[in-house]
Amino acid sequence: MESRKGIKEVSMNFLDQLDAIIQNKHMLEHPFYMKWSKGELTKEQLQAYAKDYYLHIKAFPKYLSAIHSRCDDLEARKLLLDNLMDEENGYPNHIDLWKQFVFALGVSSEELEAHEPSEAAKAKVATFMRWCTGDSLAAGVAALYSYESQIPCVAKEKIRGLIEYFGFSNPEDYAYFTEHEEADVRHAREEKALIEMLSRDDSDKVLEASREVTQSLYGFLDSFLEPATCCHCHKA
């Protein structure tokens, strides 16, 4: 009995550490999103962000596929598949919803597709992909959890800012955020359960994945507040 209690305490402590890492670099605390919440971003900054974020939006289903294809646990695969289907199934799917947001900012389809992603955007995607294709499935799921667990409150605040400060009135224009405000509550809950289910003496990798992902998210957002941001805005 004592042994089981000990195992549970270690597990809870491990998951608490994971959440602490995420909270320490929560995206809502980043100056870029704080400016978004206060209406202090320019339209050009939002356009640059929307175009550069597109690389991650397109890659997200691949992160899920990389983990799903290597997972032997049937129940875990079902949860991963549900998340993947949420991303890609139906019309509009999540990529389509992101495009609706981009177009509402005045960016054309041609401009979006021709955009050359920044080094920060590439680094973020590479970080996710490295963990999702690595030798620890739990660490791969932790990379996703470190992102998706933040999204519901981030999406809610983004919607408020878009309506209050940036003239968004058509719900279709911010439907991407509405969808994720709801769906990622479930995704994060399932991912946390998967981390505990799949973890095999690799808690250090799980925590390292979270540290690297949260740092890459901050690095990406940093790039829109630097003097070089204007380069994002004028790239094709």
Curated annotation (Swiss-Prot):
- Cofactor(s) demanded: Fe(2+); Mn(2+)
One Gene Ontology biological process = small molecule metabolic process
Q: What is its EC number?
A: 1.3.3.-
| InterPro entries in the record | Fol-rel_CADD, Haem_Oase-like_multi-hlx, PqqC-like, Thiaminase-2/PQQC
In this chain's numbering, which residues are marked as the site (Side-chain cleavage)? Y33
| Role description | Involved in de novo para-aminobenzoate (PABA) biosynthesis. Acts as a self-sacrificing or 'suicide' enzyme that utilizes its own active site tyrosine residue(s) as the substrate for PABA synthesis. The side chain of the tyrosine residue is released from the protein backbone via cleavage of the C(alpha)-C(beta) bond, leaving a glycine in place of the original tyrosine residue. Reaction requires O(2) and a reduced dimetal cofactor.
Protein name (record): 4-aminobenzoate synthase
